[in-house]
């Protein structure tokens, strides 16, 4: 069941049960429901002792409850917008958060007697298995991306059966089994971390795999994916260096190979000037870009961030309540943001698309206030510091390597959260589950 949960991470934008709301298109949700059922069953039968870190994790959730009470009168009187009222948005978004908290709790309960190393091996195997399936699909999608249409019937066949929206990426960007190209790129960042972890044992075999991942990311044309991969690769090398392992020099050589592959690929994909290409990509996220292709998206993304921060500043203690930011965003968008058709659609009550916030941090600030954001960040920082302590102080070499992996996944998750405004980022919840379990194992050994 855990294998399936991780295996289905890249399967997004799929046909699903309407009752699941925004989660219906995420295939991992369905094995996750079974996992929650098992967690409840284990709780009834065995009454397990709660993990201390999980109890700490419930403190930010308490702020959600306080925010509901603090804003309840505004929530119930919220006029209908885009066919939703305050209570329906409160229920749907609270359900998403509670669901992933229950998934994390269930993982802790169901796998209480299993070692972190065993669980990690299952997760890594699932990541590579789904990646191989994804790669097979991408082989048929790449001809379309580079301008050929002879594989379109096969792509359409898959879309007609599985995808919620039957269309091909009209900009000819690789999206694989995901809803859109950025989602694919985010998943491939996870595969990069798994690849580096496995490369400790058989590095040569994984150089080609890393190259293939880099090719797929370049064909997704994601503006942040290549930069994310470079950052997370360097972060992994930094964390690995903290282990003071005798193999550190060899591993740094391997990291150098990985980065060299990334830079060469970047250079080739940009006509021979990778540095200039990377700088242009960084500049392309600005609202002052001359790139019309990116401008509408940038105005929408930065406009929503600006509006979310403004909402948070006006409601800085508890925010406006979970799920409520969309009602306020149209009044807070800056004038320059309306240059984007996306913002105009988000502000139109007749358009069904709910106004998004493209970062969990600004969303938490607007909906849960400064207290909610501070507690969320504190929880993550505490876990990160405890993992760092394992890396530098544990006498168990394998625990050090596991801590490096989990610390890298947590950092990656927090980077992805900077451009993802929903709590349904499964890799984050799996990372903190494994981190809490490893910390608990270390505590038990030291007692």
Show which residues each predicted segment covers.
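Loop-to-helix entry and N-terminal half of a specific, functionally important transmembrane alpha helix
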Residues: 2-6, 205-213, 351-359, 366, ...
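Helix-loop-helix junctions and helix-breaking kinks within/between transmembrane helices
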Residues: 15-27, 67-70, 74, 92-95, ...
């Amino acid at each position: 069941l855990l294998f399936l949960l991780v295996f289905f991470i890249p399967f997004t934008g799929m046909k699903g049960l309407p009752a699941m709301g925004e989660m219906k298109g995420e295939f991992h949700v369905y094995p996750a429901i079974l996992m929650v059922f098992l967690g409840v069953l284990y709780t009834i039968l065995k009454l397990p002792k709660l993990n201390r870190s999980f109890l700490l994790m419930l403190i930010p959730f308490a702020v959600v409850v306080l925010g509901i009470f603090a804003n309840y009168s505004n929530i119930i009187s919220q006029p209908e917008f885009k066919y939703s009222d305050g209570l329906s948005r409160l229920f749907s978004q609270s359900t998403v958060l509670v669901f992933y908290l229950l998934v994390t709790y269930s993982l802790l309960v169901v796998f209480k007697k299993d070692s972190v190393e065993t669980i990690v091996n299952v997760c890594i195997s699932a990541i590579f298995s789904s990646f191989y399936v994804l790669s097979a699909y991408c082989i048929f999608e790449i001809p379309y991306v580079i301008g050929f249409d002879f594989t379109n019937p096969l792509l359409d066949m898959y879309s007609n059966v599985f995808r919620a929206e039957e269309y091909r990426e009209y900009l000819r960007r690789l999206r694989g089994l995901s809803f859109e190209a950025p989602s694919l790129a985010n998943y491939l960042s996870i595969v990069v971390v798994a690849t580096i972890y496995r490369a400790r044992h058989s590095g040569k075999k994984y150089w080609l795999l890393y190259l293939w991942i880099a090719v797929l990311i370049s064909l997704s044309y994601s503006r942040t994916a290549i930069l994310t991969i470079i950052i997370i690769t360097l972060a992994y090398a930094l964390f690995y260096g903290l282990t003071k392992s005798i193999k550190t020099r060899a591993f740094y050589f391997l990291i150098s190979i990985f980065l060299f592959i990334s830079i060469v690929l970047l250079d080739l994909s940009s006509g021979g000037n990778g540095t200039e290409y990377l700088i242009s990509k960084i500049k392309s996220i600005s609202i002052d870009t001359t790139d019309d292709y990116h401008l509408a998206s940038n105005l929408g993304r930065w406009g929503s961030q600006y509006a979310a921060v403004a909402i948070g500043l006006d409601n800085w203690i508890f925010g406006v309540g979970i799920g409520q930011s969309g009602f306020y965003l149209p009044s807070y968008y800056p004038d320059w943001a309306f240059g984007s058709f996306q913002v105009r659609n988000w502000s139109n009550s007749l358009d069904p698309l709910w106004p998004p916030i493209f970062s969990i941090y600004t969303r938490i600030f607007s909906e849960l206030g400064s207290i909610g954001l501070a507690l969320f960040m504190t929880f993550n920082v505490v876990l990160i510091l405890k993992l760092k302590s394992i890396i530098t102080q544990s006498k168990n070499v394998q625990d050090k390597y596991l801590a490096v992996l989990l610390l890298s996944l947590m950092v990656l998750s927090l980077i992805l959260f900077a451009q993802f405004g929903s709590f349904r980022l499964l890799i984050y919840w799996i990372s903190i589950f494994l981190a809490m379990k490893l910390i608990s194992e270390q505590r038990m050994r030291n007692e």
